[in-house]
Amino acid sequence: MSPSASPAPDAFLEDRHLALAERARSFGEYRLRATAHDEAHPEERTRQIVGQLGAGGLLGAAIAPPHGSMDLRSLVVVREQLAYFSSLADTAFAMQGLGSYAVSSAGTDAQKNRWL
């Protein structure tokens, strides 16, 4: 049995998680698959991926409410789909969550409005 990028229905996932997983899968299919093995310049490619994740609305899954939509299941389904297509994309997504956590949990309102 080979792995599949399609999210499977799960008793632990709500419809919103399945929809988010499908968005992440579609992102991987159309933005990552063709270039997944072209990671000769990881710094440049990482910036490109993060920009695409932001434009695609997926970075919100790495940011806590009210500025984002993060909950554990959302975080997991996005990372699962990104990792299927590109470990660099998964790492870039995870790093955005690590970087934004300090601002979302302890930043001033001005910092949150600027960075999140």
Residue map of PLM features:
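A non-catalytic, amphipathic alpha-helix used as a structural packing/dimerization or gating element
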Residues: 15-30
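Glycine-rich flavin
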Residues: 32-116
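Intrinsic disorder at enzyme termini
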Residues: 1-19
